[in-house]
């Protein structure tokens, strides 16, 4: 898998975000943030970011956080295949330094990867009502 962060690896529409918020199959709470994830049945993960002005006041800080989150996701996406992930920032996240944040995200990705979705296996059921029986 390539290490890019192309358009196909992003959650873009409100419908995509709503699907993750309404029925997350994975939740990883962290210090000053929350990771919500949902199975996506694709061969790649997708990322969405929610960083409001209420939780991180300065736009410079919000942009720094988004840049670090995208970079960390890009580097760990091989272990996150099959997830739609939304990161929700909480108060105080803007005060965390870059090295600490990078380390924190590494741990969060590992915790999420442990709950990796299992691909659906197609099986044929042969029953009494089937025409072959």
Curated annotation (Swiss-Prot):
Classification of source organism: Bacteria, Pseudomonadati, Pseudomonadota, Gammaproteobacteria, Pseudomonadales
Gene name as annotated:
rnpA
Under which EC number(s) is this enzyme classified? 3.1.26.5
How does the annotation summarize its subunit structure? Consists of a catalytic RNA component (M1 or rnpB) and a protein subunit.
Protein name per Swiss-Prot or TrEMBL: Ribonuclease P protein component
Q: What does this protein do?
A: RNaseP catalyzes the removal of the 5'-leader sequence from pre-tRNA to produce the mature 5'-terminus. It can also cleave other RNA substrates such as 4.5S RNA. The protein component plays an auxiliary but essential role in vivo by binding to the 5'-leader sequence and broadening the substrate specificity of the ribozyme.
The species this protein belongs to is Pseudomonas fluorescens (strain Pf0-1)
**One GO BP annotation here?**
tRNA 5'-leader removal
Keyword S-adenosyl-L-methionine present in the record's keywords: the answer is no
Any one Gene Ontology molecular-function term assigned to this protein's record: 3'-tRNA processing endoribonuclease activity
Instruction: Tell me the keywords, alphabetical order.
Output: Endonuclease, Hydrolase, Nuclease, RNA-binding, tRNA processing
Q: Which domain of life is it from?
A: Bacteria
Cross-referenced NCBIfam families: rnpA
